[in-house]
Amino acid sequence: MRVYVDGEPVDVPEEATVRDALEAAGVSVPEDVTIAVFKGEQKVERETDRLRIMLETGDEELSLTVAVEDERMSEVCEELPGASVSWTTRDEVGLGPVDVSDLEFHTRRGVEVPPYTAILILPTNDPSEAYFLITKRRMAVEYICTDIHGRVTAGRELVDELRGGERVTHVEPVVERATERVVSRVTLDDGLEAGDRIITRVEIELEKNAPVSAEHLLNTLEMEEGRLRIKFRTDTFTSIEPRPFYDLPEENVDMRERGVVTVRNRGVDEGVVYVYRRDRTPVESHNVVGRVRRGMELLDVVAEGDRVLVETDPPRVNFVGLTVDEARELAEEFDVELEVNGDGDVVVDQEPRETLNVLKERKVRVEVVPEDEVIEIELYEDDAPRSVEYFRRVTKMLDRPVGRLKVHFAYADLGMIVFEGNEKLGKKLPPENNPKDRVEAGVLGVTNQAKPHAGLIGVRLEDSEEYGPTGETFEGTNVIGRVVEGLGRLREMDQSDMGRTVYVREVRGER
């Protein structure tokens, strides 16, 4: 029988499993990622987030449709049958009263509200005497119940025709008739039927007008070995657990249609990646970085904590951390002119930094240093996540495998070398992954907020049962990693090296 793997046809026996089909297609996937199978389409009826409010006026029946943006607004609308239009002005229409004694809410005064917004107001501060208000123009509203609102999406012209006394007869959900794609999660050992379409990954085409945000997405993928972990899922979007990133610019603000990928550029969720499942209007806090070209159905069935394979077009073009020979091969692969500055073997910086800008300019300038000037380190991100994030931020390694440290002081006779940190950020570092009995030579650590010199970064040059890499006692020390290669080079440094730049390159592997 014939099935399809990521769009490609594959012939397999009748009793074949998902695993058999993947092997026949030459496709391998990690055991911990989610896979789906698309079975076809079916006609369905489903409720939407909109409610139809029916009003009676004489022999005529009027209909208004409100898109509900909060569950409590649905509960308010359920109380409307029997209520009447109590007043109309050139600015607003009020229906009620309605009893909302069972709802939790807060009230504010003088809140600016757009036209044709449905809100709840509490003019007497008595929840049994609340009113459902529809605005006709932008206006400041008094005694508004915050976070209980909706939008009039149909029947706006009728709002202006209401004169008072019209009665709400009933409220009903708006039902959509749609064609629904039948998709289900599967395991590698599940059986298949003829025509099944196996989806193993999501393919994203990057937008050329969001190079910085796209690089953040590419870095997140690279650090997670091509997999993204689902953080949150709603009917509107699926969000991805991000790598930390700061100071994202506003770029390529556009419509958030189904399949659009965005990165939040501000706020507490800065850096979070979103894939939209339903259309939404543009918002300045979201940069559109790409569009799902294949595999959107997989994101319709994932759950929080799932991992999905993701590929991008184009893939990341990052030279930092490569040898000069590797950099030349990469430049040739993508038809990019390579300009090498400096004497050495290891690329420690590149300009432009962003993949999309490199491909746009078809030229990249890289800075190289001798390999023996680059210290290789392993970071313990799982054991000390906040401290490792701090280290990457200080060294500018949030999106690159190579960073820079400046020597603060080097005393071989004291058994440590200390590098400059960021005192302001360091004061926010809580104790985590403190040493227990001893600190071995090569251990990398930072001073936490328990000590005056919070934020200093250090490497232990010899074992100690008393002091950490920055010379602090164990309660003031957060262990963040170890030196894998180059400890001898650090031992050669002394006070004449104060202020010198030391390059560090992260290697990932088993401890």
From Swiss-Prot:
SS bonds (residue pairs): none
Family annotation (Pfam families): PASTA
Family: Belongs to the UPF0288 family.
Protein name from the UniProt record: UPF0288 protein MK0796
Species per Swiss-Prot/TrEMBL record: Methanopyrus kandleri (strain AV19 / DSM 6324 / JCM 9639 / NBRC 100938)
